[in-house]
Design a protein with these regions (language model features):
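NAD(P)-dependent dehydrogenases' Rossmann-like dinucleotide-binding region
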Residues: 1-8
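A structural signal for short secondary-structure junctions
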Residues: 123-126, 134-136, 188-193
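An anion-binding loop in the catalytic cleft
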Residues: 132-139, 157
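Oxidoreductase and adenylate-handling cofactor-binding alpha/beta cores
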Residues: 8-20, 50-64, 159
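A conserved regulatory-domain signal marking ACT and ACT-like small-molecule sensing domains
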Residues: 155, 160-195
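Glycine-rich phosphate/pyrophosphate-binding beta-alpha loops
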Residues: 138-150
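Substrate-binding/catalytic subdomain of NAD(P)-dependent oxidoreductase enzymes
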Residues: 25-122, 127-129
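Catalytic-loop motifs flanking and including active-site residues across diverse enzymes
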Residues: 48, 152-155
Length: 195
């Protein structure tokens, strides 16, 4: 599970913590440089779906195409949705989720209700985060800035350096870091994989 779009997270945080409408929170995100003039890819879940496709390749060895990923954005949420969720003890976050069983992987992006105590529910502002679950360690959370000029420029420069020094060709697939790579995994709807 992860919050893979800092713009959407900023908007949802502003709506929850300051009672802003969706339109007002989006306008503020644009003013601060977190959202593009056309924010469609951020708010409809497309950007998160693209990032989830990359993560699925790394984690499961599955070459998912973003259009194969079920998605729903935050652009239909309003202040009442946020308020009702809060009254019930929940926070709404746009989550990218991946599950797998022995033969299939399910990939999904949608607004999700998380209990206020959930680690991902506590990620605020223009931050991204990924929660990873391990048998021994339990839940671990990795988070950092996810929108704006600084984080974007930093990522681009890091990618250019990787290309310049030849690190970009060392992919997880080439290194065969997972045992199930290339064994016929299919991408299925979430309800078929997740129990």
């Amino acid at each position: 599970q992860g919050i893979l779009n800092g713009t959407s997270n900023f908007i949802l945080t502003a709506m929850a913590e300051r009672g802003l409408s969706y339109a007002a929170a989006l306008a503020e995100a644009q003013k601060l440089g977190y959202a593009e003039a056309d924010p469609t890819l951020d708010v409809d879940g497309s950007d998160a779906a693209h990032k989830l496709a990359v993560l699925a390749q790394i984690a499961f060895g599955v070459a998912a195409k973003p259009h194969e990923i079920e998605r729903q954005g935050i652009d239909t949420l309003d202040a009442m949705d946020i308020r009702f969720a809060d009254e019930l003890g929940y926070t709404i976050k746009l989550l990218a989720e991946a599950w797998s069983d022995d033969t299939a992987v399910a990939l999904h992006v949608a607004p999700v209700l998380l209990r206020h105590t959930d680690l991902l529910a506590q990620v605020r502002g223009a931050y991204n985060a990924i929660a990873v679950y391990g048998d021994v360690v339990g839940e671990t959370l990795y988070q950092g800035p996810g929108a704006g000029r600084g984080p974007t420029a930093s990522s681009v420069v890091a990618d250019l350096i990787d290309l310049a020094v030849g690190r970009a060709q060392r992919t997880f697939a080439a290194a065969r870091l997972w045992s199930r790579a290339g064994k016929g995994f299919t991408i299925e709807p979430a309800e078929r994989v997740r129990s």
